[in-house]
Amino acid sequence: MKVLITGFDPFGGESINPALEAVKMIPENIEGAQVIKLEIPTVFRKSLEKIEEKIEEINPDVVISIGQAGGRFGVTPERVAINMDDARIEDNEGNQPIDISIYEDGESAYFSNLPIKAMVKEMVDNGIPASVSNTAGTFVCNHVMYGVLYLVNKKYKNIRAGFIHVPYIPTQVVNKPNTPSMSINDIAKGLELSIKAIVLNDNDIKTVGGAVC
């Protein structure tokens, strides 16, 4: 099995992106799966283009994209991505699409086909705070998750794909009072455990993972 895992470069005035740094730290072989790492730009369209180029090059079985979600307390596999770009801030090339569909011929939303609840269970069972997230936002993270799942739906039907958001690391919250963070080692461990769960689970487990609101 080949797993392509991507991480964004820093954005929004940050000098580091824990998503990318954690991706760099994970092993290149997990439960017999080959792990291929890719840095992508925090830029609308270009991020997707780079991922599709890599898909064409290596023909992966799984594509997992990792992004930073400052303010979250744990590692959060995403359930769904929506067909909407609505950028609160500019991306790294100054683009700021507002209320624009990602793909005009795409569905309103695409759901991850990764075993997200099994991933959460694997992390929690090993001491990593984790939960299912039901929104990937409307910035480049959602753009990438939706775009990859669109490509899976249209062209690469044998690929399993999804997205994981990770918290800030401690150095990022020094001047952000009351903002949660997680060590880069724990984030990397969470990603490793998530890949383990993907390798070991063709189908997701049935367990509570929803939210009231």
Curated annotation (Swiss-Prot):
SUPFAM superfamilies assigned to the protein according to its UniProt record, in alphabetical order: Pyrrolidone carboxyl peptidase (pyroglutamate aminopeptidase)
GO biological process: proteolysis
GO cellular component, one term: cytosol
Single Gene Ontology MF annotation: pyroglutamyl-peptidase activity
Catalytic residues (UniProt): 78, 141, 165
Top-tier EC class: hydrolase
InterPro entries: Peptidase_C15, Peptidase_C15-like, Peptidase_C15-like_sf, PGP-I_bact-type, PGPEP1_Cys_AS, PGPEP1_Glu_AS
Reaction catalyzed: Release of an N-terminal pyroglutamyl group from a polypeptide, the second amino acid generally not being Pro
Listed Pfam families: Peptidase_C15
Highest taxon in the source lineage: Bacteria
Localization (cell): Cytoplasm
Keywords: Cytoplasm, Hydrolase, Protease, Thiol protease
E.C. number(s) listed in UniProt: 3.4.19.3
Quaternary assembly: Homotetramer.
Function text: Removes 5-oxoproline from various penultimate amino acid residues except L-proline.
HAMAP family: Pyrrolid_peptidase (MF_00417)
Family: Belongs to the peptidase C15 family.
The name this protein goes by in its record: Pyrrolidone-carboxylate peptidase
Species this chain originates from: Clostridium perfringens (strain ATCC 13124 / DSM 756 / JCM 1290 / NCIMB 6125 / NCTC 8237 / Type A)
Lineage: Bacteria, Bacillati, Bacillota, Clostridia, Eubacteriales
